[in-house]
Regions:
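Charged, low-complexity intrinsically disordered terminal segments
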Residues: 1-279
Length: 279
């Protein structure tokens, strides 16, 4: 067994100071270049059904076999090299495009790549967009696509935790509620004892997005992330059914009730709105 000398972060360098804030946020397992597992699932105690039972985190992971596993192995090797030699210049190859396909972000090499793909799928939606994410403060590209889709009559639903971890991230998410609901976006807060950690989207029961990125600036613009995009009605149906099951453990935020929230909450959201651009 070999372990990388990196702990998922990049050491400080005066030549590359911005890279200090980057981290490897991917959740990827590849077995013999035959099968890959990816999504939001971390290998940690909080995900153990034996230790936490029904209190474990609510997450989504997917398993895929075939050529895509070899592509995932190549992406892993590239990240391993970057961890061992963080400031070396490595040539990158796009590789073969598969359906479904993997979308990596390498910060400066893939700046806004995942955000643009997310927004592009939402912009092409015709009937419904169901998004599950622990944090929703994605920046203007995705935020605008979500609101415009709702405005043109698409059934847009956003599932986020009621209680965020850490708590202040909830201020960032909630600071955008009013604007989204004004455009017709339906917002649901997950209230089950389990913490919501899944990062998925399903568009028109057909296009599916599963991976490691949260819909926030750190994931979309800074971190090393990996996402699967698939046009698969079978997977889309499964994700839609899971979304409906999650809604049974969620409560919808109603615009009239939201307008009556207290000034303390409004003040915290104002702080969150200001911080959205950096977090």
């Amino acid at each position: 067994m070999r372990a990388s000398s990196s702990n998922g972060t990049t050491p400080w360098s005066w030549r590359h100071p911005s890279r200090y804030f980057q981290r490897n946020h991917r959740k990827l397992l590849v077995i013999d270049e035959r099968e890959l597992f990816l999504g939001g699932f971390n290998i940690r105690l909080e995900n153990s059904i034996g230790l936490y039972g029904e209190g474990r985190k609510r997450d989504t992971h997917v398993s895929i076999s075939g050529d895509l596993a070899r592509h995932a192995a190549a992406l892993f090797d590239q990240m391993w090299q970057d961890a061992e030699h963080p400031y070396a210049d490595f040539a990158t190859e796009e590789g073969t495009v598969f359906d479904p396909f993997l979308v990596p972000s390498f910060s400066c090499l893939g700046w806004k790549r995942i955000a643009c793909l997310y927004a592009g799928l939402i912009e092409r939606s015709a009937h419904r967009v169901y998004i599950t994410t622990p944090y929703f403060c994605p920046g203007s590209i995705v935020d605008t696509a979500v609101r415009q889709a709702a405005r043109r009559g698409v059934d847009v639903r956003l599932l986020v935790p009621r209680d965020s971890d850490p708590s202040f991230v909830g201020w960032l998410t909630r600071s955008g509620y009013s604007r989204m609901m004004a455009e017709g976006v339906h917002i649901y807060q997950y209230v089950a004892p389990r913490k919501l950690h899944a990062k998925t989207a399903v568009i028109d029961d057909e296009w599916c997005v599963i991976g490691s990125p949260n819909l926030d600036h750190l994931s979309l613009l800074v971190n090393h992330e990996l996402v699967l995009i698939a046009r698969d009605p079978g997977l889309g149906s499964a994700l839609t059914e899971q979304f409906y099951r999650d809604l049974a453990d969620a409560s919808e935020v109603k615009p009239n009730a939201w307008a009556k929230r207290g000034w303390t909450e409004r003040g915290l959201e104002a702080v969150g709105w200001t911080a959205r651009k950096i977090l």
